[in-house]
A protein has these predicted regions:
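Conserved acidic
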Residues: 6, 90, 150
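Active-site-adjacent helix/loop segment of glycosyltransferases
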Residues: 19-22, 96-150
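Short glycine/proline- and charge-enriched loop/turn segments
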Residues: 32-33, 50-53, 78, 119-128
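Conserved donor NDP-sugar-binding/catalytic core segment of glycosyltransferases
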Residues: 1-35
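A short, conserved alpha-helix in the catalytic core of glycosyltransferases
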Residues: 1-2, 52-54, 58-78, 83-112
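Short, flexible, basic/aromatic active-site loop/helix in glycosyltransferases
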Residues: 16, 33-60
Length: 150
């Protein structure tokens, strides 16, 4: 992942391909729909070929499950916005603010991470809570970014 910063000098954040523990593809970077809902590239699609991806490619955002960025950029944009606490859309907002600084958001197909999706919130909250929290934060996110996304 570190190599991406050398190859792509304007890189603001880089993330790996994410897989569920069983090995199924969770996402290869993310796009954003005009309504703020994510497009998780390749999600659960057995025909999606990670090997066919470029080594580094631009995406709208990468998941905070595994995200690398420069400390100076993190401090300059003020880190994660606490308005999204405790979870959901904080990583998406962070990447949007980096993009607003002219930084690129990159996926590297050369790194993979196994991720138990929603494990943090499901350990203390219900699936219904996670859905409500995600939707609440999507609306906050759209309040900040709707003009850019549409």
């Amino acid at each position: 992942m570190l190599k991406c910063f050398e190859i792509q000098p304007d890189c603001g954040a880089v993330g790996p391909v994410l897989r569920w523990p069983a090995g199924t593809l969770q996402e290869a970077g993310c796009g954003l729909q005009p309504d703020g809902y994510p497009i998780r590239h390749g999600r659960g699609d057995p025909s999606f070929s990670v090997k066919a991806l470029k080594r580094y490619q631009l995406v709208d955002y990468v998941s905070g499950a595994c995200l690398m960025m420069r400390r100076t950029d993190f401090l300059e944009i003020g880190g994660f916005d606490p308005i999204y606490s405790p979870a959901y859309y904080e990583d998406t907002d962070l990447c949007m603010r980096l993009r607003g600084m002219g930084k690129a958001i990159c996926l590297t197909s050369r790194a993979e991470c196994y991720h138990i999706e929603n494990a943090t919130s499901h350990g203390v909250e219900s699936a219904e809570w996670a859905t409500r929290q995600s939707e609440k934060n999507r609306l906050i996110f759209m309040g900040k970014w709707d003009k850019i996304l549409k």
